[in-house]
């Protein structure tokens, strides 16, 4: 597929203008994987294709569920065609179980289950390690309106339970999930960016020892070829499993 000019480039993707439609953009999924706000970086050959496949599978499911997203098409495994958005500089995190940074902040929460899923906001700022930000501060800083904060909270929970149900059909527990939102030129709020195997914690049979997500890379003491091959195999399995969500639909 022909690509337009580069709009922006991040750690794991490049965003291109669409060559013919100014309302669209094209995401190119790179082979990079990072952890610690980019402090650890590696390249896994083929990861971009797997990330693109997973993202397409996820967003097709969300679109079928009636959730407003930026996803339009995935003409190639590495490419995602999306509605062009101005991104809101927030990570919206939904949690069913306490893990990761939440458990470090709230060790007393070990063993709890959040119903409905807990929603937290984090300001996208690598230099400050993406600090948590309260809804009232989001509003005070003019990042989003009160209505948008409410919409992101409600939509975040809908996204989570939709993906949670899909994973449950495969005996996989969705522990937590990170998403982002963008605004179209018309002001519509959409689930945007990517949702791939870097975006969640997933535990087959509810067992963290079997985790399939990026946490394997984060947790590793040593990054070597064996680790990267293992991570790639897990990403390939996730791309294949999420592909089953569209079977027969």
Swiss-Prot record:
UniProt KW keywords: ATP-binding, Ligase, Nucleotide-binding, Purine biosynthesis
GO BP terms in the entry: 'de novo' IMP biosynthetic process
One term of GO molecular function: ATP binding
Annotated Pfam families: SAICAR_synt
Cysteine disulfide partners in this protein: none
Gene3D superfamilies: ATP-grasp fold, B domain, Phosphorylase Kinase, domain 1
Family stated for the protein in its record: Belongs to the SAICAR synthetase family.
Name listed for the protein in its UniProt record: Phosphoribosylaminoimidazole-succinocarboxamide synthase
Organism in which the protein naturally occurs: Chloroflexus aurantiacus (strain ATCC 29366 / DSM 635 / J-10-fl)
Name of encoding gene: purC
